[in-house]
């Protein structure tokens, strides 16, 4: 254990999330193309930053985006390591305070327990350990935001299902409001530091739903790539104090059993990696559909997959899709009684309901109202348009739904946080590459409407 780090301190630091991954990073120099400083905060130990060779001092600096209390810094050195270096923290990128220093670096991974508050963290090398430069596979900073009023996760901590409601760690019934991504295989460029800063700070969202399609060019085409993307997005949501819903976005194959093997593999890794976090929820089956996909099929799938997650993450809420496009069975001629009479035999779970206001009228609204008095419900997707995610907005019907959700403290997530051409995407086409996400100038009509409702003060 590095000098100054105690066993007790290491346990405390481990409770804080990784807050540096994907953040803006700069360096004093770069040895060559492909070794840029961003490679040291990309979550991969196969890419690295390297400074110019033969020059002291050199530094690498990460901008956490807002003031944080920093409790841990982990440095994974390449062969070109620092013999002497300092870890420093700053409120403004100009005035620096040392939180760790050593003159006996040996090139091993340095896992440092530190204590400091600031927006910027810098590793400042003063003596190279080799004739080369300085090179890091990863620079990981762990901590928590200290923004005024606290983040949703700071306010609520580990969520749990209490009776038929979602509650925070204090036992208070709460409602989360936020946005769903579009498919990350198509619109991953809409999920970056600037857009998620806007979602957390300008929109004041509580939750980000990370929609990873399985087919349609998604997970099945490259499981490693898409799993790593989800890891990264969980870290980015965590760094901003938002909850993250990991959405297993099955669609074309409406039977969840079709992808059960893939789901076991994916959720095992996600739960293993993130089980120490307090902000992760697992949505294990987006919109089961098809005449042969009965509630019994979905329930059996849940009974097989939930233990896979619980083996590694015993505390996070798990969200179970419902029959006929997560409509509680309404789109297939049923209703909530099929679940009430035969619920999933597991604790700390909720059932999902999706609606699109221009397509789903009073039958859906009434079913939701009844179901919410008997079952724990989470609306993990809704739109103000038709079920295609396009067409005219029905804001009047949408408001009826949102009024009911507020009354019954049902959490909701809107579809979708992208610049897709359809009316359901909140940004106008071309917004994401240009990076202008705050305010309303680049929002469609539906985007302005839902942003206003997400920004309404939370009752935490």
Segments the model singles out, each with a brief description of its role:
Residues 183, 188, 260-281, 285-419, ...:
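Extracellular glycoside hydrolase catalytic/binding regions
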Residues 108-114:
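Exposed aromatic-hydrophobic patches
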Residues 85-87:
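Short beta-strand elements bearing conserved aromatic residues within extracellular beta-rich modules
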């Amino acid at each position: 254990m590095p000098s100054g780090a105690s066993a007790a301190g290491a346990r405390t630091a481990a409770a804080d999330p990784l807050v540096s991954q994907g953040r803006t990073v700069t360096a004093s120099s770069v040895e060559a193309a492909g070794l840029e400083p961003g490679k040291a905060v990309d979550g991969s130990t196969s890419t690295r930053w390297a400074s110019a060779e033969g020059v002291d001092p050199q530094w690498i600096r990460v901008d956490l985006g807002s003031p944080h209390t920093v409790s841990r810094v982990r440095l994974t050195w390449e062969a070109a390591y620092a013999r002497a270096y300092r870890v420093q923290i700053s409120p403004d990128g100009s005035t620096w305070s040392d939180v760790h220093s050593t003159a006996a670096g040996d090139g091993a991974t340095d896992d440092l327990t530190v204590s400091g508050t600031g927006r910027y963290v810098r590793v400042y090398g003063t003596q190279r350990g080799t004739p080369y430069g300085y090179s890091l596979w990863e620079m990981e900073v762990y901590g928590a935001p200290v923004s005024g009023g606290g983040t949703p996760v700071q306010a609520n901590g580990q969520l749990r299902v209490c009776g038929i409601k979602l509650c925070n760690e204090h036992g208070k019934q709460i409602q989360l409001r936020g946005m769903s991504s579009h498919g990350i295989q198509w619109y991953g460029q809409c999920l970056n530091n600037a857009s998620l800063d806007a979602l957390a700070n300008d929109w004041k969202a509580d939750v980000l739903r990370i929609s990873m399609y399985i087919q349609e060019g998604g997970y099945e085409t490259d499981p490693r790539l898409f799993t790593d993307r989800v890891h990264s997005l969980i870290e980015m949501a965590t760094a901003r104090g938002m909850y993250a819903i990991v959405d297993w976005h099955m669609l074309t194959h409406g039977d969840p059993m079709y992808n059960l093997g893939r789901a076991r593999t994916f959720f095992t890794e996600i739960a293993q990696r993130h089980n120490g976090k307090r902000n992760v929820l697992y949505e294990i089956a987006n919109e089961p559909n098809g005449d042969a996909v009965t509630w019994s099929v979905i329930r059996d799938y849940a009974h097989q997959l939930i233990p896979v997650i619980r083996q590694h993450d015993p505390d996070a809420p798990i969200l179970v899709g419902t029959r006929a496009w997560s409509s509680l069975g309404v789109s297939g001629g049923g209703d909530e009684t099929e679940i009430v009479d035969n619920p999933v035999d597991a604790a700390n779970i909720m059932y999902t309901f999706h609606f699109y206001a221009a397509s789903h009228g009073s039958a859906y609204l009434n079913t939701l109202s009844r179901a919410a008095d008997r079952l724990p419900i989470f609306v993990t997707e809704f739109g103000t348009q038709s079920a295609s995610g396009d067409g005219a907005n029905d804001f009047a019907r949408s408001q009826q739904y949102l009024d009911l959700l507020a009354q019954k403290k049902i959490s909701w997530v809107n579809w979708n946080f992208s610049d897709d051409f359809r009316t359901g995407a909140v940004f106008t086409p071309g917004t994401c590459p240009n990076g202008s996400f705050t305010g309303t100038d680049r929002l469609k009509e539906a985007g302005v409407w839902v942003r206003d409702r997400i920004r309404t003060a939370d009752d935490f």
